Amino acid sequence: MARKTPLKRYRNIGISAHIDAGKTTTTERVLFYTGVSHKIGEVHDGAATMDWMEQEQERGITITSAATTCFWSGMAKQFDEHRINIIDTPGHVDFTIEVERSMRVLDGACMVYCAVGGVQPQSETVWRQANKYKVPRLAFINKMDRVGADFYRVVEQIKTRLGGKPVPLVIPIGKEDDFEGVVDLITMKAIYWDEASQGMEYDEREIPAELQEKAEEYREYLVENAAEATEELMNEYLENGELTVDQINSAIRQLTINNEIIPLLCGTAFKNKGVQKMLDAVIQYLPAPMDVPAIKGILDDKDESEGTREASDEAPFSALAFKIMNDKFVGNLTFVRVYSGVLTQGSSVYNPVKMKRERVGRIVQMMANSQEELQEIRTGDIAALVGMKDVTTGDTLCDEQNVITLERMEFPDPVISLAVEPKTKADQEKMSIALGRLAKEDPSFRVHTDEESGQTIISGMGELHLEILVDRMKREFGVEANIGAPQVAYRETIRNTVEQEGKFVRQTGGRGKFGHVWLRLEPMDPAGDVLYEFKEEVVGGTVPKEFHGAVDKGIQERMKNGVLAGYPIVGVKATLYDGSYHDVDSDELSFKMAGSIAFRKGFMAANPTLLEPVMKVEVETPEDYMGDIMGDLSRRRGMVQGMEDLPGGTKQIRAEVPLAEMFGYATQMRSMSQGRATYSMEFQKYAEIPKSVAEAIISKFNNKDDDE
């Protein structure tokens, strides 16, 4: 089969935003204008096409990134038909992981901001992730029809808060109820969309007289920026003081792909104005798969050298599985982004991470919540494979004769845990299957069994994250569960350097046990990348080489279960520097025990302490409730980091608060502000716990031990 759309006319993009910036509505309009959905689904009615999970429709927020394909040839049909694959990303902080995994497979992104709320905390998180993966982006300032909308303030915030370089391509005509359309700064024409046709048609007119001066000022700023793209353009601009429309467009494309500027558009998706222009900008300024650097990976040779895969159908097949979902009709869906080559239905792929081959049963193209079966997928395609048995999010799929492992995605450790048990004993096995499937879909969600209590513990990125997963168990797998109180993932560490002896001796007739070591324990940064290091400095064979690994193992097992209060230990460098052995009685177990004993004693002597997860919390509240909210945050051991005035008499408070103090915060904050304040939080760092709080946690642990 030949390729239908040339690769240069592909755009793989994400639409990304803070919760409530109107991202789902924007995506809906995109699907409407590109002809995919004939009835516009409103989030307010719980009928949006991209929000296909029931909980998303209930909560009016987007949780999973559904991938949708659509086609666009421009507002005035001025382009050849382009294929746009859209990955819808969630805007709630508990789902940051979803954003991260979709950023990984995008070539470009549209950042949607609310003209009233501006740049919100989640916008900063998404921005950092886009920077990390060097994703070229353009921005769309939405909700221009809302009271308090201010285009120019949001432009300023993108500069100051995000450190981006926004270059407006349009400026708004009017605002709030009087928002009518935009001035196109490239063609210097006013554009008005026709409301009767839901914005499908538009007309160009002269710029309103009162905006002429402002339009000229912003046009000059645009042309100055465009001229910086190349030396030739700069010379042309200096000579003639102007550039042609084509020159401006190609310069902006180049600067956007190089991540030097953020082209800016505005409108109101709800009132069908401006999204059409944003789609044109996606085609004009965001990269095709071959415009971004070739994907890197590790080759399957003895040196594990780095290799790349060019975006071409002729190159060997390589793809990244970026999302796994369960569909009640077809079963397991593995969403993949194809970076190179071609994959046909019925052929096999190799998974170098699991070192397994798998046969591809069916390939489906997702249209929000309907599917179209495909015979093959090619470079640049985003589609779902049906029935893959052993693929996890982040795995590579490639040609078995040309193995490459694409960069793995890194997922943060969970910060909150809950005990869960099925409401009826009969559901125990069903619950295990359900949790296993959910953990496969979402690497930031972990499941384990507590060895002491035998309880099933689930861990994730926030209360909402776990709440939704428990809810999905009930809806998708029919398992109702009881959940325990949330538990915080504390850590233990040391503050001083110590040297400690550890001896394990059992000699009572016959063959005994003998292990003897000296360890030096030193503190490392518990927030660093390396959380444990084992070094050997044994001189003269006092501890034979073959037992060094056993000492390391003994230490690591002890670190897993903690010493102070049963929490994992981090930030320790252990050096084995001396000891002794017995020709007959020494074995691996003896040295493993000796290592564990020395570590436990040394840990208690090295001024140990507990660490707790501290969250970055941002609260937006009307000024009247400011005092109560600040007082409440400081009662929760919060440290206020800064405050800012927002429009409409709203204040934003930024604080760092221990996670342990944030349980039930939403309810408390609502009652203090009569439901008018909102907040968001995300993990910031691990920090030392104050002595009085730590003592309470440790004594609780010791009492539990005594009871047992």
Curated annotation (Swiss-Prot):
InterPro entries associated with the record: EF-G-like_DII, EFG_II, EFG_III, EFG_III/V, EFG_IV, EFG_V, EFG_V-like, G_TR_CS
Residues annotated for GTP binding in this entry: 17-24, 88-92, 142-145
Transport is among the record's keywords: no
Location, primary (coarse class): cytoplasm
Family per record: Belongs to the TRAFAC class translation factor GTPase superfamily. Classic translation factor GTPase family. EF-G/EF-2 subfamily.
Gene coding for it: fusA
Protein name: Elongation factor G
Any one Pfam family match given in the protein's UniProt record, by short name: EFG_III
Record key words, sorted: Cytoplasm, Elongation factor, GTP-binding, Nucleotide-binding, Protein biosynthesis
A GO MF term: GTPase activity
Cytoplasm among keywords: yes
Subcellular localization(s) per the UniProt record: Cytoplasm
SUPFAM superfamilies in the record: EF-G C-terminal domain-like, P-loop containing nucleoside triphosphate hydrolases, Ribosomal protein S5 domain 2-like, Translation proteins
General function of this protein: Catalyzes the GTP-dependent ribosomal translocation step during translation elongation. During this step, the ribosome changes from the pre-translocational (PRE) to the post-translocational (POST) state as the newly formed A-site-bound peptidyl-tRNA and P-site-bound deacylated tRNA move to the P and E sites, respectively. Catalyzes the coordinated movement of the two tRNA molecules, the mRNA and conformational changes in the ribosome.
Signal peptide segment: none
Entry's Gene Ontology BP terms: ribosome disassembly
GO cellular component, one term: cytoplasm
Domain tr-type G: 8-290
NCBIfam families referenced in this protein's UniProt entry, alphabetically: EF-G, PRK12740.1-5, small_GTP
Xref: SMART domains: EFG_C (SM00838), EFG_IV (SM00889)
Highest rank taxon of the organism: Bacteria
